[in-house]
Amino acid sequence: FSASAGFSGNSSFASDAASSAATVGAATGAGSGTPVTATVSITPDSVWPYPDNAIASTHPDRKEQNFRLYPKNTLIKGPVKTGKFHQAIMTAVGIIEGKDSNMMNIEPVPDVLEHYQQYVDEGRILHISYPDINSDGYDGFIERKRGPFIENGIFKQFANKCADGRYVVMMEEVDLNWMHLFRETAVLLRENRREGTSSETAITLPFSKEKFRLPSNLYIVATCDSIVCEDTILGAIDHDFFIRPVSPEPEILHGMRVEGISLQRLMTTINMRLSYFLGADYQLGEGFFLQSPDKDSFISLCRVFREQLVPLLEKWFDGDIERIRYVLGDNGKSRPDTIFFQEIPFRDGLFKGELPDSFDKERRIYRCNEDAFYNPKSYIDIYD
């Protein structure tokens, strides 16, 4: 699997971070949206990619109990593209630098990104993309037995090498099954089970038979889509994780217009309709509307709608185009050239004879009007 040594920029703060893309993007891939990865091969002779001076299993900081600005474990949940990853970066940097959230919120975004990458390089932050590690499961995360060898997983290695200061494991885009990575070690996540606490707990690992503990200076920050994290699952981990909700912020788009389109009104209207049909978790974050560079911004908006938004709506509505048309306002548009999904009428005589009563005689079919995506009026008519 790959442990990310960089990060892909979250669109919700793309406008703030644009000026830093040239300096940070080259090292991290943030400018292109593509993570830079360092492949860690888990073998008995593997080379740990972080400095040797991080090895200090008996360092007193591992038992630190006085730092209270952040909980040991944080799960940031919210709808798609609401800035969860940005919040996770701010949290991780704040933990290491000892700055609370208010102080982090006034830090210039380029500085935060630069510090984040610095701490990844120094081995203070372990950035894990959950989809990458999920396929390897517990074996790649904690440990596995391969023949006569015991191979340490990425999380176990990182936890064992926490030394002075504070360390953060960043887990991006976890899903309902993510706790299976921890298995029996999940009990160690709880704050009062960490090293140096009155209820310090050690687990005997199944393959190595080693006593495994989690240091108190190790913090976990995870992000998840609110759609995949059901309340029942969150309730099962709320004793171990502080759950921080993140909501869409259309006010960020205040005053922003593209070809006469009010991005704030567009986002607000679509989200209200989505909430009506599907619930509050099914909303669009401001990141959808901040992906456009200043030049060619309308074309970028068109492509976001056609290539990202429409497929997402089709997934959420299980292909029910009629309800998607209501979300996009197609049902009330007067001009055919602004309708994204146009109804195709059945011609007379399509079938020979009358259809049986058991057939759906009210069925409708639609075609996607590609030209509508490149017409500013199509978007204005969604909310106007």
Segment roles from a protein language model:
Residues F1-F7, S11-D384:
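C-terminal regulatory/interaction module of P-loop NTP-utilizing enzymes
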